[in-house]
């Protein structure tokens, strides 16, 4: 994810990591950053998720990466989450997920809908691994409510 969708990609990775108690390695990147290293670890167990922007110019670059990945496929799966109709996406993606929000939206607002896909994937993966999503880390390394953090008073200067 890029710009406003970078946060969605980051939260997607974090949620999957959290709900699978670290048994599923995750990462996020921009389409440019992904080409410079992370793409090299893709194997037949990998699901790559691409979030497409509603910005027509930006979407061209995002689709270029999806096309590149589809043509270099190594048995991995590709999911593409998008709002508007996207010609040819069904042939490129194993899981074309269209979340029709309607009119063009700012990426930040699209993210509110797009994150539901990631949360569902994380939940289903957690259950498939026999991990309880309500308490994925019973040993306490990761807690639902962060512990051990002190909130210090802040004075506006």
Locate predicted features:
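A SIS-like phosphosugar-recognition module
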Residues: 1-157
